[in-house]
Amino acid sequence: MSYKSHQLIKDHDVKWVDLRFTDTKGKQQHVTMPARDALDDEFFEAGKMFDGSSIAGWKGIEASDMILMPDDSTAVLDPFTEEPTLILVCDIIEPSTMQGYERDPRNIAKRAEEYLKSTGIGDTVFVGPEPEFFIFDEVKFKSDISGSMFKIFSEQASWNTDADIESGNKGHRPGVKGGYFPVPPVDHDHEIRTAMCNALEEMGLVVEVHHHEVATAGQNEIGVKFNTLVAKADEVQTLKYCVHNVADAYGKTVTFMPKPLYGDNGSGMHVHMSISKDGKNTFAGEGYAGLSETALYFIGGIIKHGKALNGFTNPSTNSYKRLVPGFEAPVMLAYSARNRSASIRIPYVSSPKARRIEARFPDPAANPYLAFAALLMAGLDGIQNKIHPGDAADKNLYDLPPEEAKEIPQVCGSLKEALEELDKGRAFLTKGGVFTDEFIDAYIELKSEEEIKVRTFVHPLEYDLYYSV
């Protein structure tokens, strides 16, 4: 059999193969092996054994053996290694059955795609996420029994207008909420973003746009072309890898955490979605904003299950510091054409082929495999049960009087609430065995540990508020 990997190894004299997978929390992991061992066809049938008990939320030590099964279609050269290295994304396989591990996020995403086909609603779901991030010059933080702190260093930050800078303070920097999107020199990050885009293109992603985002201190976005669900989740992990490593090469540091700065915009990951059947966009129609009834029902499913979705789309305590009014983060579970204060937006498009919906509440802390799969399952449940989203909200939802605002459902206010909603509202996720109860239980337990740790940790602001009581 002919393998793409074998050709790349031979053509580029590849010395090492890097096997990658994503854990439950969304962090990409890897193990590296000599390229000569990947030239055997058996490698793509038998995979590589590893210890699953070392991955949080997976196996116990008494049954820890698992298999990394490489996906040859994902083979790509790593532009950051000194020695020629080939990257292969892997699925996690259960050795006893040689089937996909039910807690492997990539396998969950694959099952979601298969479930879509089984419903007859469509054969392909297209996903286009927009993960935002911050580029800092340096960051320091600590949290232990002696105290806690964090400090961000950013030459372009608005708070550095009077700072002593070795190369001189040139004064050109975006203010709070002023980063969208002046030309250089106010945009300090143009060159590094371009380098990031070059690396992304080298790794096979199709860059559509890059720009500075709203917040000061280096908030940025790189827009990449949409793809099918699993492929796009793979690409999100590639994007994070590229962005982190280019920043490191420039002597800078990147974070995808949703709200690193108090008082300025946080980073979202708006997710564009549409479903195709027999090559036709099922979301295009003659209804509101050019949507079909199918698309409206899809929106209805996301709105109905919005709070449960938060457990996967906004999976950190920090996520809920972003989801507050006043910083362009949507907190109202409503939909509208072009209205960015609604949690579901219908972007303007010139062609029905591009008709889609945009979920605006997710953030880049999310595991992309789990978030995209969960959004799809919510939308499909809406279609199957004909859940209409009601009237569109074409006014600024941030300015609604209290009596109107209370009639509109909102996203969760905390990770604790999101996990509780996920626990009690999970039925739409377990259809077709896409998400299993065992996985959801393990996920909730894993994320609850984070929530409890943050909730019980002594916060520096508490000293400011209460030290002198």
From Swiss-Prot:
UniProt note on regulation of activity: The activity of this enzyme could be controlled by adenylation under conditions of abundant glutamine.
Q: Which residues bind Mg(2+) 2?
A: E132, E213, E221
**Primary location recorded for the protein, binned into one broad class:** cytoplasm
Q: Per its Swiss-Prot or TrEMBL entry, what cofactor is needed?
A: Mg(2+)
Q: Which residues form the GS beta-grasp domain?
A: 12-97
Keyword S-adenosyl-L-methionine on this protein?
no
Q: Which InterPro entries match?
A: Gln_synt_N (IPR008147), Gln_synt_N_sf (IPR036651), Gln_synth/guanido_kin_cat_dom (IPR014746), Gln_synth_cat_dom (IPR008146), Gln_synth_gly_rich_site (IPR027303), Gln_synth_I (IPR004809), Gln_synth_I_adenylation_site (IPR001637), Gln_synth_N_conserv_site (IPR027302)
* One BP term from GO: glutamine biosynthetic process
Please give the residue positions where the record annotates the modification O-AMP-tyrosine.
Y398
Which gene holds the coding sequence for this protein?
Answer: glnA
Spell out the SMART domains in the cross-references: Gln-synt_C
The record describes its quaternary structure and partners as: Oligomer of 12 subunits arranged in the form of two hexameric ring.
Q: A Gene Ontology molecular-function term?
A: metal ion binding
- Write out the residues that bind Mg(2+) 1: E130, H270, E358
Q: How is this protein named in the record?
A: Glutamine synthetase
Say which family it is in: Belongs to the glutamine synthetase family.
- As recorded in UniProt, its EC number(s) are 6.3.1.2
Tell me the residue numbers annotated for binding L-glutamate. N265, G266, R322, E328, R340, R360
Instruction: Look up the coiled coil feature and give its residue ranges.
Output: none
Enzyme class name = ligase
Q: What is the reaction catalyzed?
A: L-glutamate + NH4(+) + ATP = L-glutamine + ADP + phosphate + H(+)
Q: What does it do?
A: Catalyzes the ATP-dependent biosynthesis of glutamine from glutamate and ammonia.
Which residues does ATP bind?
E208, H272, M273, S274, R340, R345, K353
GS catalytic domain segment(s): 105-469
Q: Say which species the protein is native to.
A: Pseudomonas aeruginosa (strain ATCC 15692 / DSM 22644 / CIP 104116 / JCM 14847 / LMG 12228 / 1C / PRS 101 / PAO1)
